Amino acid sequence: LDSYGTVLATPFNMAHTQPEMNALVSRLKEFDEPVTILLEYTGHYHYPVLKKLQDEGFPVCVVNPYQMKKYGDVEIHKAKTDKKDALRIATYALEKSYKLVPYSFMEQKYEDLKFLSRQYDQRIAFVAKLKVQLINLLDQTMPGITKFLALKSRNPEKSALMLFIKRYKSFDEIQRMGKTRFLSTYATLMKKTTDRHAPQKGLAIYELARDSITTRGEDPYIWSAQDQCVDLLAAAQNAADEIITQMQNIAETIPEYKVLRAMNGVGDRLGPVILAEIGDIRRFHSAKALNSFAGNDAPPYQSGQFESRNRHISKRGSSALRKACFEVMQALKLTKPQDDPVYQFILKKEQEGKPYNVAKMAGVNKFLRIYYARAMELYR
């Protein structure tokens, strides 16, 4: 569209290849007016177009898909096609040109951190899924075993339950071994684990195995499935640990990471994740903007004489950042650092009668405000 809203070119398809992108660039350079380009966030699929056009010197802006959805809600007769979406985005760019800001990539280390954070989330999600699958299998071969040996995937080579599954397969196998032989082999096996309490549970586990009824305890196919789950779980956890180590190495080169790690509740895992989700702190003009980015803001609602005093957070922001910060609040509640302002703020909100999780999210708000103030001091 030109500045008068006239359609200069009807929507057309274009592959993300050099020949077709070069043809688009040539066409854009033919226009007499300055060109403003607006793209919609589409995962990582818009990055080739964004990179190519920026390299050619065009100002490229990027809009959130939710904004475009709400912008299209004003239409009475709604229609959803790629061609109509293209015209809708162009109209939005023309109408909102006064507030569009060209997209700029963060420093490479921030981009790398964010990429690794997404990979870490995927590995951890896979770990959680494998744990559910493994417990489902254990309900058929070793019902109740997790009451004595918890399923912990950290340091899988020394996990008591994972070693136990690999060695004994099912309760039927334990019954065949007999009490004396089982207790002897169990004591030897538990020397490989870091669980301090596991060695004392041998007799209780044997009694559980003796009294339990298994449904597929002698099935070699379920034994194979269990072993595969254990191996996959160990591999996924090791992959997640490797990624978090890479994130720690990058984070240590960023000045504000020391500020973040010095805050109570932030450890070697949550620190890099929070830093990855926030990115460069200098891109936020205020602590309020940082909370809004996290979706932890509560927009005002007022109409006439009515003014709401019981508002909910918007959740229009990074859910990964909210989750990581919420885990920091959980750590504060466990460790109870009496001199920590965030912990004291959570206690204050709880004493005011706020629900448990509402008080924690209020703590997240204060946590991000404190972090913003301390981190920005490094760049002043």
Tell where the protein language model's regions lie, with residue ranges.
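A detector of single, family-specific signature residues
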Residues: 1-380
